[in-house]
């Protein structure tokens, strides 16, 4: 038993997996008590919604259900790790452009923000931005306030974000030309 502890547990690659897991930050967004009606009465359980990210541009969310809260959270975390998405960030702190996303009746509007703005977002969206590594963003949710719809709408918006490289490829120009236009456009806007 002591030898197993020294090697990192019973599972293969235990120590390596712990190091991989430590790079992720997870946030519990929502926990819900659910009931299944059976012949003998009601059987209670819990559903958890977790967002996980490495604060460097990768983020995912997961949903887990179990009879006990810790088990539901563990299942949701495992599900989130399997559904990671890479999101391009501008200067490693904000979005490249303003975007909108929707899922069901939930709609979200995300705006890139200047340095020092902070995360101006409510509830589930804030958890996504914190785990993603975004430091400056302004977000607004309209319609459904259901956390599941808000998370999915946020992911829909992030999925539709274009990096400067993809925009440059689409327009057949160099990224440096595109960036120069962006900087020039900002200078013209501030001069007015």
UniProtKB/Swiss-Prot annotation:
Transmembrane segments: none annotated. Keywords: Ribonucleoprotein, Ribosomal protein, RNA-binding, rRNA-binding. InterPro entries: Ribosomal_Su5_D2-typ_SF, Ribosomal_uS5, Ribosomal_uS5_bac-type, Ribosomal_uS5_C, Ribosomal_uS5_N, Ribosomal_uS5_N_CS, Ribsml_uS5_D2-typ_fold_subgr. Gene3D superfamilies: 3.30.160.20, 3.30.230.10. One of its GO terms (cellular component) is small ribosomal subunit. Residues 1-21 are annotated as: Disordered. GO terms for molecular function: rRNA binding; structural constituent of ribosome. It holds the Pfam family Ribosomal_S5_C. Coiled coil: none annotated. GO terms for biological process: translation. Residues 24-87 form the S5 DRBM domain. With S4 and S12 plays an important role in translational accuracy. The N-terminal domain interacts with the head of the 30S subunit; the C-terminal domain interacts with the body and contacts protein S4. The interaction surface between S4 and S5 is involved in control of translational fidelity. Belongs to the universal ribosomal protein uS5 family. Part of the 30S ribosomal subunit. Contacts proteins S4 and S8. This is Small ribosomal subunit protein uS5. It comes from Afipia carboxidovorans (strain ATCC 49405 / DSM 1227 / KCTC 32145 / OM5) (Oligotropha carboxidovorans).
């Amino acid at each position: 038993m002591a030898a197993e502890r020294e090697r990192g547990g019973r599972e293969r690659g235990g120590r390596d997996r712990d190091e991989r897991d430590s790079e992720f930050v997870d946030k519990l967004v929502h926990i819900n008590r659910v009931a299944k009606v059976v012949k003998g009465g009601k059987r209670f359980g819990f559903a958890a919604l977790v967002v996980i990210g490495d604060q460097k541009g990768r983020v995912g969310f997961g949903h887990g259900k179990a009879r006990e809260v810790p088990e539901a959270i563990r299942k949701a975390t495992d599900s989130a790790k399997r559904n990671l998405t890479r999101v391009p960030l501008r200067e490693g702190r904000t979005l490249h452009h303003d975007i909108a996303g929707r899922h069901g009746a939930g709609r979200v509007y995300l705006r890139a923000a200047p340095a020092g703005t902070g995360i101006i977002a409510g509830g589930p969206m804030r958890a996504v931005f914190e785990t993603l590594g975004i430091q400056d963003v302004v977000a607004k949710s309209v319609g459904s306030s259901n956390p599941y719809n808000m998370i999915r709408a946020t992911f829909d918006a992030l999925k539709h974000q274009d990096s400067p490289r993809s925009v440059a490829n689409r327009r057949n120009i160099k990224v440096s030309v595109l960036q120069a236009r962006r900087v020039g456009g900002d200078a013209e806007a501030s001069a007015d």
